[in-house]
Amino acid sequence: MGKQQPISQRKLLGVAGLGWLFDAMDVGILSFIIAALHVEWNLSPEEMKWIGSVNSIGMAAGAFLFGLLADRIGRKKVFIITLLCFSIGSGISAFVTSLSAFLILRFVIGMGLGGELPVASTLVSEAVVPEKRGRVIVLLESFWAVGWLAAALISYFVIPSFGWQAALLLTALTAFYALYLRTSLPDSPKYESLSAKKRSMWENVKSVWARQYIRPTVMLSIVWFCVVFSYYGMFLWLPSVMLLKGFSMIQSFEYVLLMTLAQLPGYFSAAWLIEKAGRKWILVVYLIGTAGSAYFFGTADSLSLLLTAGVLLSFFNLGAWGVLYAYTPEQYPTAIRATGSGTTAAFGRIGGIFGPLLVGTLAARHISFSVIFSIFCIAILLAVACILIMGKETKQTELE
């Protein structure tokens, strides 16, 4: 078989972005399905918390294992494998009738979701010139907002009328996209030209924690943990929080859809600023905005304040995610880039395990949401401190 022709940056962004969109759509739909299962299966907050956390356990395992595999067999192959993993798993989960079976499948789906994100960002970052790399990666991450919007629309129109099973079957259709990727997507040119492909996975893991890279690895691991801990604690529970505050399921879905709309301007503003002010400082500013919004969302005592804080939370938090995905691969050379991105993202997914567990546990004990969201506020501020102390600027640096 002949070598595939190079792909334009715009087409690569669209191709990888669609994979990112499907990933976000699955995660977004899960937040609405948790709320639906709360009603249909009469789940308690203690049971609800495990759905999001098991998903994050799978994402942690997937981010680490598929990151290692991407440095061994290539970015493209792993991108396709992870896409098939979560799309087929979602389709099968539409037919389960017990929480235990649903949880097992959410672990498998989570592995695909967790593996796809760092591999896709690595693939794109290696194909873009330094002057545009940060902006393109943030724009790649903006597909996450479109996926969440699609999830909110599907949940609003499909779940109340046709059930949560129909929503999951729709996400399974993304498996067909893998067939397109197999023939249209070339692998990373930097990976293809790499002479160190025969390095063992263990050698790559050791290199990530070697003296030369331990500072960015520790910094990114802490930041990813705090950001993902807060994100999944807050966003997976948004529809359920609205339900627990007394709104109907339809009202809850409407309000979360409104909040989700703010994600796109958050991404676009970060994409515009990242090549002007740099990764480090834009990340700090957007995380501070996230912390403040989380605090006011938790303490809101009126619908208008709740929606305003929710919109700002979406704007700042998802903008920060975009910058973090641009910032992470730039810390490592090509030989260990996917391993480094996957390893630090795996620490983040561990945070994603504890976030939903924390909310479910505290909500079951009738702890106020002002206290719960204050905890997330503090976690985000810890990430800010870590970046300020240990982070370096990587704006427009040439990738090794």
UniProtKB/Swiss-Prot annotation:
The keyword Transmembrane helix applies. SUPFAM superfamilies: MFS general substrate transporter (SSF103473). The keyword Coiled coil does not apply. CDD domains: MFS_SV2_like (cd17316). Residues 36-49, 164-165, 239-253, 302-304, 365-370 are extracellular. Its main location: membrane. Disruption phenotype: Partially reduces sensitivity to the toxic niacin analog 6-amino-nicotinamide. It is a multi-pass membrane protein. Belongs to the major facilitator superfamily. Sugar transporter (TC 2.A.1.1) family. This is Putative niacin/nicotinamide transporter NiaP. It comes from Bacillus subtilis (strain 168).
